Amino acid sequence: MSRNKELGRKIRLMKKVKQNRRVPGWVMMRTARKVTQNPLRRNWRRGNLKI
């Protein structure tokens, strides 16, 4: 991907980066470990972004 990106694409990429994090520990404690995995997790090589 090129170094110079449009602002809209950059914002969408940043949103996907933020979504690709693990569930915080305090969320697991608050939900009594019912929520332990993030369904939006994606591997950078295997998952394709449709942006």
Swiss-Prot record:
Molecular function (Gene Ontology), one example: structural constituent of ribosome
Keywords (A to Z) from UniProt: Ribonucleoprotein, Ribosomal protein
SUPFAM superfamilies attached to this UniProt entry: Ribosomal protein L39e (SSF48662)
GO cellular component annotations of the record: ribonucleoprotein complex; ribosome
Top-level taxon in the UniProt lineage: Archaea
UniProt key word DNA repair: no
Family to which the UniProt record says this protein belongs: Belongs to the eukaryotic ribosomal protein eL39 family.
Name of the molecule in the record: Large ribosomal subunit protein eL39
Gene encoding the protein: rpl39e
